[in-house]
Amino acid sequence: MLFSKSLVALVACFLPLIVSATELKLRNAAATNVAADSYIVVYKDIDDSTFESEMFNVHSFLSKRDSTFRGLGHKYKMPKFKGYQIESDMDTVNRISQSPHVAYVDKDVKVSAYDLSVRIGAPWGLDRISHRNGTSPGLEEYTYDSSAGGGTTIYIIDTGVYIEHVEFEGRATFGANFIPGSPDTDEDGHGTHVAGIAAGANFGVASKAKIIAVRVLDANGDGKGSNVLAGMQWAADDAGKKNQTAKSVINMSLGADYSEAFNKATEAIIAKGIVVVAAAGNEDANASGVSPASTVDAITVGATDRNDSRAAFSNWGVALDVFAPGVDILSAWIGGKDANKTISGTSMACPHVAGLAAYFIGLEKNGTSTPSKIATKIKGVATKNVVLHPKNSRDNLAYNDDGY
């Protein structure tokens, strides 16, 4: 009897796959910077049992249809976001998408780190975010509460982190690696630089926060959206297992063409109680066209220079919540335990604000922090009306509320 019920369920599931396929439920059809023949199938808000049945049936169908099928890729299972990555041809994905449980399909967008030019400079950014009225020339003075993000964790979803760097004082660990065949370290430098800005001993905003590296980009700073989503889920699950959700921040100094799957996954993580901070992007374009920057409840960060002018490369628009220093930023680098480098990008602005988020969470005495409260705090205390040429963006410049 149990076998009969299973058989009926299996046949019912495959009806949409057997009939003529109708229009593919593809949301980001215009995206061009994508991984070939790779898709993310996103389901409606179904229960875990139904989702597991869907994956089993799709796997069975594809195994019979294609002898070279190697199985489904990353699986994503979070509240209000369930799906998986699949490598297959458009016709096959079209048929799979006809299941009544499938909400939509996204092309697997390519993701890149947001760094730019290299130049000798100094960590003036810390000085700026702790002073209302500009930097202190020659002083590089950072005024902050000595709690400095203690008791919080910042997940750096990036190229990895060189955790042995002296800037991290043993506070950095390597959490997970989603680049097959790569070592558990940073081969590019971008992730280490970002981590240094967020929580380095000398370069960092929250210098007592823990750092956990989640590698989703390769040695060139590139990767696939499906790997980034897997890294995001790992970070959310890790924070949950440690009962540290309310004390965790995810930094995403990376981006891709707009992807609804990307944004929905980001919203799902925020709904779990984790602050997500995203770089606006470096195309001098509307940030509403990139992900995860366009996610409504993420804290999206644009870049400014020493003169409080929006950086020429920084994306802009209503998706931005706040600006932060992002030009000529000095931080940790790879190649030696005390290596450093000065680079620019919204990738550098983003960890200033991720560090601020951890800093403000650390100041909470009763542990009632939420992503909404932290976002409101960051936008509320930001220095207003000082950013030059914000270009239809909120004129907020990040501030730690402890300087003068």
Curated annotation (Swiss-Prot):
Record-linked CDD domains: Peptidases_S8_PCSK9_ProteinaseK_like
Family affiliation: Belongs to the peptidase S8 family.
Site positions (Cleavage): Y114, D115
Keyword Hydrolase assigned: yes
Sample GO molecular function, one term: serine-type endopeptidase activity
Signal peptide region: 1-20
Glycan-bearing residues: N133, N243, N251, N286, N307, N340, N366
Enzyme class: hydrolase
Gene Ontology biological-process entries: proteolysis
Entry function: Secreted subtilisin-like serine endopeptidase. Mediates the degradation of collagen, the major structural protein in the mammalian host. Degrades the nonhelical regions of collagen that function in the cross-linking of the helical components. May function as virulence factor involved in epidermal wing necrosis observed in white nose syndrome (WNS) in bats.
Active site: D158, H190, S347
Keyword field: Glycoprotein, Hydrolase, Protease, Secreted, Serine protease, Signal
Subcellular localization: Secreted
EC assignment: 3.4.21.-
Protein name: Subtilisin-like protease 3
Pfam families: Inhibitor_I9, Peptidase_S8
Inhibitor I9 domain ranges (all copies): 38-112
Propeptide: 21-114
Peptidase S8 domain location: 123-404
InterPro entries attached to this UniProt entry: PCSK9_ProteinaseK-like, Peptidase_S8/S53_dom, Peptidase_S8/S53_dom_sf, Peptidase_S8_Asp-AS, Peptidase_S8_His-AS, Peptidase_S8_Ser-AS, Peptidase_S8_subtilisin-like, Peptidase_S8_subtilisin-rel
Main localisation: secreted
Domain of life: Eukaryota
Keyword Secreted: yes
Gene Ontology CC terms, in alphabetical order: extracellular region
